Amino acid sequence: MRDNHYKLFAREDEKARQRFERDIVRMIRQLYNCPCIGLWVPFNEGWGQFDALRITDIVRKADPTRPVDHASGWFDQGGGDVRSVHNYFRPLKVEKDNRAFVISEYGGINCQIPEHSMSSEVYGYHQTSEEEFPGAFTDMMKTVQGLVSDGLCAAVYTQVSDIEEETNGLLTYDRKARKA
């Protein structure tokens, strides 16, 4: 899907798009010397995405030293330096592309430990018990490691710790219990 359908992406307001362009350049200039930033991601999962190819050019001009994931996870426009996929439901695999292939979100193994949770509500993609979580996580890591020989360049497990209703972290919300 092309990302110039501004209404569909909730970007009808031209002034808001202009502010985004101004602010992303300001942000890059402010954070340019932070060594922990390895990659710029102007759009994640289509939230407010618009003109990603043109925005990638703006980002590259502001910082030509770092790669760009122009549209992380969803509405890939064929630009940027990586092909970025979010995959919680399908078998993990490498898709062939001329860019580096990255599984930029995967995991979602839900394991709620009630006494360490923020909420009684739970959200996750694969339900497990406290006893099952370490094995499920290890199996997923083995699958990801096996994809390196197929061309996988990076992978990001979601997520390090539980947040409010999402209990798919390696640590609980209060950081007092480690699940794997």
Where are these regions (language model features)?
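Active-site mouth of glycoside hydrolases
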Residues: 1-82, 91-97
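Substrate-binding clefts and catalytic carboxylate motifs of secreted carbohydrate-active enzymes
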Residues: 36-40, 95-180
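Short, solvent-exposed loop/turn segments at secondary-structure junctions
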Residues: 47, 75, 89-90, 107-110, ...
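Solvent-exposed, non-transmembrane amphipathic alpha-helical segments
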Residues: 47-51, 57-60, 79, 88, ...
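Generic structural signal for residues positioned in beta-strands
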Residues: 67, 82-84, 102, 169
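Residues at the C-termini of beta-strands that transition into short coil/loop
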Residues: 72, 86-87, 105, 174
